[in-house]
């Protein structure tokens, strides 16, 4: 359950959705993507029981540790919401993942390296990162068209250097699941590096 907010809804409806997925042949567990401000205590207690019987990882869309950035991109939650959600989830013995976007407006190289140290202080098990991508039809794409000077889009070598610096400031036990993302070419405005994910990983 990766797209959208997969913990939003009535508890019984969410239970039915998860349990239906677990009945599918060859499904060996659940990875549930959600927002840090959308995990109720009741659902967390239910998931604490689920993880006793199957693989379970809850992944939070953190995006940034900077509250000014979170307001700028209209996320509707704070970094403290992330800290609380991650600590509550990990405290239940549930594997806990995070997702961040590198290169959001106003965040410089040194800010992002500091972000890695900040994230290392919370009990994440896994982390996914990817570069800021401007997608056609989005509010941010419109903002880029109006004020491109507000955006710094990394070229591939610059982003590789950033990722290396970022990793060096992460806890060594964090499992890194992704360094880069690849949007459909017909939707992508920038940056267009012309690299497949595996090609980027090889260069890292």
Over which residues does each language-model region extend?
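Active-site glycine- and acidic-residue-rich loops that bind
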Residues: 37-41, 75, 104-116, 153-160
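Auxiliary Fe-S-binding modules of radical SAM enzymes
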Residues: 126, 133-204
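Acidic (Asp/Glu)-rich catalytic clusters
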Residues: 18-25, 45-55, 87-91
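Short amphipathic alpha-helices and their capping/turn segments at secondary-structure boundaries
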Residues: 39-55, 83-84, 113-123, 168
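Conserved, mostly hydrophobic/aromatic
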Residues: 1, 32, 60, 98, ...
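Short, electropositive alpha-helical surface patch
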Residues: 12-22, 48, 108-125, 156-157, ...
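Core AdoMet radical
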Residues: 2-11, 25-39, 55-82, 125-128
């Amino acid at each position: 359950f990766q797209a959208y907010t997969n913990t939003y809804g009535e508890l019984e409806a969410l239970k039915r959705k998860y349990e239906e997925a677990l009945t599918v042949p060859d499904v060996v567990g659940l990875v549930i993507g959600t927002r840090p401000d959308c995990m109720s205590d009741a659902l967390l207690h239910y998931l604490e029981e689920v993880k006793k019987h199957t693989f379970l990882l809850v992944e939070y869309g953190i995006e940034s540790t900077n509250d000014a950035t979170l307001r700028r991109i209209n996320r509707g939650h704070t970094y403290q919401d992330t800290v609380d959600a991650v600590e509550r989830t990990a405290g239940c013995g549930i594997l806990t993942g995070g997702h961040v976007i590198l290169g959001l407006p106003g965040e410089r190289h040194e800010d992002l390296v500091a972000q890695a140290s900040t994230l290392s202080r919370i009990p994440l098990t896994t982390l996914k990162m990817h570069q800021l991508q401007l997608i056609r039809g989005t509010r941010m794409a419109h903002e880029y068209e109006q004020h491109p000077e507000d955006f710094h889009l990394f070229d591939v070598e610059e982003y590789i250097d950033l990722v290396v610096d970022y990793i060096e400031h992460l806890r060594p036990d964090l499992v890194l699941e992704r360094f880069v993302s690849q949007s459909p070419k017909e939707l992508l405005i920038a940056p267009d590096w012309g690299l497949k994910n595996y090609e980027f990983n090889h260069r890292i």
